[in-house]
């Protein structure tokens, strides 16, 4: 079995954000995000070694194979969610929601203000992430909260807006005060990126809406 490895996407590292300092971004990107990349690659090497992760010894209570597969989900989703998070940040924000996105938000969540309030509530309530995404099965916009990279994820949810709510995302700037960090996050949304994600997500929904017969 070949070893699948990934590389960090350095071009996604944001700088000079409003209310989120470069000093905060530095450990978040270089230590946490890149740490997930490194551990994912390490796990892939071990999974490729049939002697190390002996499938014949797989066990639901404990086995090397089980532990590797669990941590694979944690580290890989840690990579993907961080890339989605960093990739949608721009200094002071950029653009605004497209007419198509605003209409969809109005239909599914009651408007932009209601959507923002829902996202902020999820960002306070959940320990890992708050996500606005498109459900590939229903075609509806949904607010999802995660307690960890791989806990409470909705299968088929395409993320549009992703808020990191782990303390490592704000501790340098705000210590244990999460609300001001969340307010700062909303000041730096690159709506051009979010609009593009929404367009692609809707195309994916149209292609897959009969996926479940």
UniProtKB/Swiss-Prot annotation:
Top-level division of the source organism's lineage: Bacteria
Catalyzed reactions per annotation: 2 superoxide + 2 H(+) = H2O2 + O2
Entry's transmembrane regions: none
Comment on bound cofactor: Binds 1 Fe cation per subunit.
Names of the cofactor(s): Fe cation
Keywords: Iron, Metal-binding, Oxidoreductase
Keyword S-adenosyl-L-methionine set for record: no
Listed GO MF terms: metal ion binding; superoxide dismutase activity
Chain's role: Destroys superoxide anion radicals which are normally produced within the cells and which are toxic to biological systems.
Subunit structure as annotated in this protein's UniProt entry: Homotetramer.
Protein name as catalogued: Superoxide dismutase [Fe]
Origin species: Aquifex aeolicus (strain VF5)
Gene behind the chain: sodB
């Amino acid at each position: 079995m070949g070893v699948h490895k990934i590389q960090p996407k350095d071009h996604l590292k944001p700088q000079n954000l409003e209310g989120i300092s470069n000093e905060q971004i530095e450990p978040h990107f270089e230590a946490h995000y890149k740490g997930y990349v490194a551990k994912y690659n390490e796990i892939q090497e071990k999974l490729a070694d049939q002697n190390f992760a002996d499938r014949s010894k797989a066990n639901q209570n404990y086995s090397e194979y089980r532990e590797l597969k669990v941590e694979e989900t944690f580290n890989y989703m840690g990579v993907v969610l961080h890339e989605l998070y960093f990739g949608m940040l721009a200094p002071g924000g950029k653009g605004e929601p497209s007419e198509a996105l605003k209409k969809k938000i109005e239909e599914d969540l009651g408007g932009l203000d209601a959507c923002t309030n829902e996202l902020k509530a999820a960002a306070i309530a959940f320990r890992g992430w708050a996500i606005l995404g498109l459900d590939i099965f229903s075609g509806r916009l949904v607010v999802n909260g995660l307690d960890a990279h791989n806990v409470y994820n909705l299968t088929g949810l395409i993320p549009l807006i992703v808020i990191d709510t782990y303390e490592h995302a704000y501790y340098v700037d705000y210590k244990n005060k999460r609300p001001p960090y969340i307010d700062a996050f909303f000041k730096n949304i690159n709506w051009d990126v979010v609009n593009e994600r929404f367009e692609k997500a809707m195309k994916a929904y149209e292609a897959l809406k009969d996926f479940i017969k």
